[in-house]
Amino acid sequence: MYNAVGIDVSKGKSTVAVLRPGGTVIRKTFDVSHTSQNLNELADYLSSLDGTTKIVMECTGRYHEPMVKALSEAGLFISIVNPHLIKNFGNNSLRKVKSDPADARKIARYTLDNWTELRQYSGMDNTRTQLKTLNSQFSFFMKQKVAAKANLIALLDNTYPGVNKLFDSPTREDGSEKWVDYAYSFWHADCVRKIGLKAFTERYMSFCKKHHYIFQQDRPEKLFNASKELVAVFPKEKTYKLLIQQSIQQLNLASEHVERFRREMNELASTLPEYSTVMGIYGVGKTYGPQLIAEIGDVSRFTHREALTAFAGVGPGVDESGQHKSKSNRASKVGSARHCFRS
């Protein structure tokens, strides 16, 4: 005996429909609030049903996660499916009905029709959910970092033009950059050229020692001579110093968050079985690899490469009818923009 449970998830509550083969209704469609008590009661009810029970719900952002957590911990079979599959399922009625109970029943019918192909939610899916959340936060702080850096450069162009191009040292593991550290100490061109070469050399040596940079004997003279040719629009005043140093602090904080998320994502992704395969792709590194895994999910559910292309939403559509046969079609736009591998 099969029990097909369709759950239409929304924010704070879900609508549940329970069907058996032949369209037999086990219980009238009902709503469940996303509270601990109500979710536990739902889990107890579904566990008490005679026969084999499978539960299907759509992947709707983060709204489905409380339901998934409660039912998976109860040992029930849960499958999370792409909403587009449900949308295109069973559209054989002239009457269009859009309501939570109707959607829940539609998901339950989908469960019955695809009973043997349903893929069960696993612990690995929880890891992938964590990875996707980290990737979202990584992207958020990366945007903040880019904005903070652009703002800082705009300010420095008025006090120490071109300071961001003085050094080509790579970004450190903590996200710090040499030119940013240098600009914090020497925020204005007058901080260099007005104190004389000898005094600047001593200050630059102290700067390198403090931040653990290699001191080069000829570097202070080059920096000193270059500063003489610069035109500073803003005067060397306390207000501009405060603005620049606060901007640097904001940039360093965003950079620290970015690097922390980058490390955490790589560590988490390395626990997944597909990690070595993805990292073996040419051009994929410790940043792009975990991002691919986060947005693609479990690659084992794709039986061929066209399935992955369709999931990403970048597959070319088919335009054929009668004698017409298009040879050049636009890529489809179905699915999340993140699945197009843009981060």
Feature map (PLM): residue ranges:
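A detector of single, family-specific signature residues
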Residues: 1-343
